[in-house]
A protein has these predicted regions:
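Ligand-binding loop in jelly-roll beta-barrel domains
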Residues: 56, 68, 76-102
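Short, conserved beta-strand element in jelly-roll/cupin
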Residues: 27-32, 40-58, 95-97
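Conserved short histidine dyad/triad with adjacent acidic residue
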Residues: 9-13, 26-42, 76
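A short, N-terminal "cap"/entry segment at the start of jelly-roll beta-barrel domains
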Residues: 1-23, 110-153
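Short acidic-glycine-tyrosine-enriched beta hairpin
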Residues: 47, 61-77
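A generic structural signal for short beta-strands and their flanking turns/coil linkers
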Residues: 21-26, 44-46, 53, 76-78, ...
């Protein structure tokens, strides 16, 4: 699935009608310059494994490059977002705990460079994502990725 303009393509690895109750698992594909989400922190831990391509991790206002097979363990409460980098798409395996979770969207100068900062600090997703376009739509991308495979171009 993908959002027309932001967030990349998302491939849930669980059925929509019966999601796992304890964890969320998906593969997210982002293109150069595109964030996977808004800069945020959650009350649970997450893990991110780069399957292919390059991306930039913004964590606690610092930018860090990630390459294929790099892994980032994100402890609960850590502010973060991932932005596509390099010349083509980047696929990331994302795993996170899924109990009722507190999410916070702080204002971030580092993330704002990529359009990945909330306009004002909030803990309301609808408020934080108010300027992001609509729903995720089903899509299939070829694997391995072709650097020209960006469906938005």
């Amino acid at each position: 699935m993908r959002n027309e303009e932001k967030g990349g393509a998302m491939f849930p690895l669980e059925p929509r009608e019966a999601p796992f109750s304890d964890i969320g698992v998906n593969v997210r594909v982002v293109w150069p310059g595109d964030p996977n989400a808004l800069y945020h922190s959650e009350g649970v831990q997450e893990g991110f494994l780069v399957l292919s391509g390059k991306c930039t991790l913004i964590v606690e206002e610092e930018e860090r490059p990630l390459l294929q097979w790099d892994y980032f363990h994100c402890p609960a409460g850590t502010r973060h977002v991932i932005v596509g980098a390099g010349d083509g798409p980047c696929a990331i395996l994302m795993i996170g705990a899924r109990p009722d979770v507190d999410v916070r969207y702080p204002v971030s100068p580092a993330a704002a460079k990529y359009g990945a900062s909330a306009a004002k600090e909030t803990d309301e997703p609808d408020e934080a994502y108010a300027d992001w376009p609509g729903e995720y739509l089903p899509i299939r991308l070829a694997w391995p990725f072709d650097s020209d495979a960006n469906p938005r171009q």
